[in-house]
Design a protein with these regions (language model features):
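A cross-kingdom marker for long, charged
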Residues: 94-219
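Acidic/His-rich structured neighborhood in mature extracellular/periplasmic domains
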Residues: 1-127, 197, 201, 205-208
Length: 219
């Protein structure tokens, strides 16, 4: 699917599986290869992941995704980051949410059979809670004038992984802004032609401000 949407991107010619240290990387891309560290995909209940030392690096809200079904998701995310590197959360909240939302939309196109919660890195309960709270989340961001915030702290609080959201409580994941960004993209895409919905290169190039203005997003 990546080659279909990004035909000019040279896919890795070799896939290398290995078992490395528990604090090592789970996926990396070289000049012509992709390396996958299986030690990072043993299943979230693996005894290896329960040690205090391991949880210093990867607390449960991260290791909940260390299961075999996340191998293709992690690989696709890394390939996408190689194709279109994202910023470091410095352009303001709404722009960063939409840029991350673009990548979630693309991820779903690349891996259409993967569960939506898994693509976000949320548990099933977190995803359901976020879906149910979407309108309240958006209204809060508007009410508190956070949508256009350029404060890097606010951006990080809403887009970085965490066990829960400091704004929306224990049931909502820390990076809830990624979900909102994806919903804005989905709202915008509903107004595009079928051909444009599959033009992922054009999506990446489309200014976030233009997408937001045209999305008419209102959950």
């Amino acid at each position: 699917n990546i080659h279909y949407y990004f035909p000019a991107y040279p896919l890795p010619k070799k896939i290398i599986y290995f078992i490395g240290p528990l604090d090592g990387f789970g996926n990396s891309i070289g000049a012509d290869y992709m390396a996958i560290g299986l030690q990072m995909f043993l299943g979230d209940t693996s005894s290896w992941y329960q040690s205090e030392q391991f949880q210093k690096y990867f607390p449960p809200y991260i290791s909940q995704n260390f299961t075999p079904r996340f191998i293709p998701i992690t690989a696709a995310k890394n390939l996408l980051q190689d194709i279109a590197p994202n910023s470091n959360l410095t352009r303001g909240l709404i722009i960063e949410m939409i840029e991350m939302g673009k990548r979630q939309y693309i991820l779903k196109k690349i891996l259409p059979e993967s569960d939506d919660a898994d693509l976000f890195g949320y548990s099933a309960a977190q995803y359901a809670a976020t879906m149910n709270a979407e309108q309240n989340i958006w209204n809060y961001l508007l009410k508190m004038n956070l949508v256009y915030s350029k404060d890097p702290k606010v951006t990080s609080q809403l887009l970085s992984e965490g066990p829960f959201s400091i704004y929306f409580g224990n049931d909502i994941p820390g990076n809830v802004g990624v979900f909102i960004g994806a919903q804005i993209i989905n709202s915008w895409m509903k107004q595009q032609s079928e051909q444009d919905q599959s033009n992922l290169i054009a999506l990446l190039q489309m200014p976030a401000e233009k997408i937001f203005a045209e999305s008419k997003y209102k959950p």
